[in-house]
């Protein structure tokens, strides 16, 4: 394996036992925070062992907290005082972040140094792998990190005209609330988009449709910024003129969404197309604002390069890219492998991935053609051993599922292995299984450590694989979202 290195900030072996009761030598009411949970709450224990989840508290702090919810064996509380502060506590970079009334809920970890955020996420990944999948990676991959601010190239901004306040709000929701935060800036958005928040509020306030525009979706490419306006009623000519004036003043492209996602269309045809580049592979990916693309393009470029380095596909390899989307991994794989198959659940995305493949093939320099690629639409949540075998032998797999994970895929692989070793209750295999071999290596990119752990448990304990490496990808700094990557090799 190339590239795995030990991360220096792992707190302890995830298979070890955590303390089951809190300290008894602190003053009454004080709590020692020992870790953070998946919602970025500090975790402490009372002397009787009862777990307390504390908003705003950090590991290794001594705190007091006000309980607002009680259950038999746990409580939820909010931080009221810090008696010993963590050296990793920092001043938040956004005035709208915090525990105060009306605070924005878009970020949860701005009070924690970004390096420590990564360590917490690594611990969350390892804990999930061990406790849910009974899997411990042989090696910890170096975390993938990038800019902590101005990284969020995709966002869904809620919009509401609040008559009582006499203003329009545009932004994320408040913490634990359906109300929209009164945001003037947002430092995780690109600077030019953050600077547009107040002008967007003024724009919507000036429109006839101010009460029927509930959302603006942001999609930034390398050179184009697109805004998708959801409107519940037809827009007047005056409103269309206001949108055009805003676009000219701020250098953005307006798209309109009168109904469902299929109705999204440009306000005015023509103009440049949204795209992002993967320069390590000479690939350019055109996309529409409603297509799924990664929120953080800086991290995505590193992620694709790292994933392909770990996959290590060569000119003799046939590779399957499961949940291929627009071809974010498929097209780079086609620069290295003999053949690649991209399989995706959405017919529309399959059509878009074919278009992207053709465009990039046409634009390749002479002598650097992409390997043959096939794109297939299939429900990947209903996979069977027969379907897996019908896809043919692949030397390596790249798996990049949504939050639901790739359970059906892992289960089909496990069923085949169990049948071949003669396990009791294993399903019978079709005659076509003879000669079919599972992939030698699987690189699994995950946006949910719980479903990764579940699938890893199947691969390791039932499908004949070992987890040779795993690590986090800090795709969403300052949030509790844990993106990760794991590598499995056949035993």
Curated annotation (Swiss-Prot):
[4Fe-4S] cluster binds at residues 94, 104, 107, 186. The active site is at 447 (nucleophile). InterPro entries: 23S_rRNA_MeTrfase_RlmD, MeTrfase_TrmA_CS, NA-bd_OB-fold, SAM-dependent_MTases_sf, U5_MeTrfase_fam. It comes from the Bacteria. Residues 1-28 are annotated as: Disordered. S-adenosyl-L-methionine binds at residues 294, 323, 328, 344, 379, 400. The keyword 4Fe-4S applies. Pfam families: tRNA_U5-meth_tr. Its EC number is 2.1.1.190. This is 23S rRNA (uracil(1939)-C(5))-methyltransferase RlmD.
């Amino acid at each position: 394996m190339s590239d795995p290195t030990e991360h220096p900030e792992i707190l302890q072996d995830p298979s070890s036992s955590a303390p089951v009761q809190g300290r008894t030598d602190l003053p009454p009411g004080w709590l020692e925070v020992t870790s953070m949970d998946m919602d970025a709450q500090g975790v402490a224990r009372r002397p009787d062992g009862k777990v307390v989840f504390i908003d705003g508290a950090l590991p290794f702090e001594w705190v007091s907290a006000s309980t607002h919810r009680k259950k038999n064996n746990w409580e939820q509380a909010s931080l009221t005082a810090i008696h010993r502060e963590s050296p990793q506590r920092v001043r938040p970079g956004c005035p709208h972040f915090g525990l105060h009334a009306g605070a924005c809920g878009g970020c949860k970890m701005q009070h924690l140094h970004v390096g420590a955020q990564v360590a917490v996420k690594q611990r969350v990944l390892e804990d999930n792998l061990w406790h849910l999948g009974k899997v411990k990676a042989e090696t910890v991959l170096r975390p993938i990190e990038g800019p902590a601010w101005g990284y969020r190239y995709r966002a869904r901004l809620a919009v509401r005209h609040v008559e009582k306040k006499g203003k329009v709000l545009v932004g994320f929701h408040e913490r634990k609330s359906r109300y929209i935060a009164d945001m003037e800036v947002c430092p995780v958005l690109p600077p030019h988009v953050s600077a547009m928040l107040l002008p967007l509020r003024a724009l919507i306030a000036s429109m006839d449709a101010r009460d029927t525009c509930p959302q603006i979706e942001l999609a930034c490419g390398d050179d184009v910024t697109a805004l998708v306006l959801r409107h519940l009623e037809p827009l007047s000519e005056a409103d269309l003129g206001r949108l055009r004036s805003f676009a000219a003043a701020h250098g953005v492209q307006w798209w309109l969404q009168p109904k469902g996602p299929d109705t999204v269309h440009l306000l005015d045809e023509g103009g440049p197309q949204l795209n992002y580049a993967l320069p390590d592979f000479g690939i350019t990916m055109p996309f529409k604002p409603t297509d799924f693309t990664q929120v953080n393009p800086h991290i995505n470029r590193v992620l694709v390069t790292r994933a392909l380095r770990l996959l290590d596909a060569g000119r003799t390899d046939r590779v399957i890219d499961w949940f291929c989307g627009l071809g974010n991994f498929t097209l780079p794989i086609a620069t290295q492998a003999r053949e690649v198959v991209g399989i995706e659940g959405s017919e529309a995305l399959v059509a878009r991935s074919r278009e992207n493949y053709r465009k990039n093939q046409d634009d390749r320099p002479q002598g650097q053609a992409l390997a043959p690629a096939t794109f297939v639409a299939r429900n990947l949540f209903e996979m069977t051993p027969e379907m897996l075998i019908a896809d043919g032998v692949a030397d390596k797999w790249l798996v990049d599922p949504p939050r639901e994970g790739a359970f059906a895929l892992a289960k089909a692989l496990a069923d085949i292995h169990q049948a071949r070793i003669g396990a009791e209750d294993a399903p019978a295999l079709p005659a076509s299984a003879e000669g079919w071999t599972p992939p030698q290596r699987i690189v699994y990119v995950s946006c949910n450590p719980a479903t990764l752990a579940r699938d890893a448990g199947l691969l390791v304990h039932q499908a004949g694989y070992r987890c040779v490496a795993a690590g986090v990808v800090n795709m969403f700094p300052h949030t509790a979202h844990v993106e990760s990557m794991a590598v499995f090799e056949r035993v």
